Amino acid sequence: MPFFEEMEIGRRREIGSYTFTAESIKTFAAKFDPQRFHLDEEEGKNSLFGGLAASGWHVGSACMSLLVADGQRLAREAAERGEEVAVWGPSPGFRDLRWIRPVLAGDTVSYANVVIDKRTSASRPGWGILTARTTGTNQRGEEVYAITASAFVPLRVKGA
């Protein structure tokens, strides 16, 4: 993972894609969001969604899973090159979470993020706070998900 100083505003990353199957939608919903339009095709079809729809939390969880996997891959590649690996901290929060369009069974959502802000932390010496806008786009090119989230990122040069 990159250090704070290496992150540039405007940097865009393709994070990965996830296909929402009827089975994965129902399994997630049964555990975490058991509403009828997430659990039953007919109920979904008769709802405002027009089909079996993934929970918005499922759409966000798929994004988080891909973000973590991408970060692990970046860290592994940096370590293989003999580079120091930045271990990112937690997220202090998010804003502007939007479920823009329904994600239906069979949809594939591709996620990407863009760094929109960065600043050094006033309360945590040695850390910066990076803010990125992450979006999810379905196979038809329609944006279906968006969130603006921040993360603590270590500074390479402590005290900067």
Each language-model region and where it sits:
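HotDog/MaoC-like acyl-thioester-processing domains
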Residues: M1-E14, W99-A160
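Hot-dog-fold acyl-thioester-processing enzymes
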Residues: M1-P92, R156-A160
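Conserved interaction-surface patches within small, structured recognition/assembly domains
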Residues: R95-L97
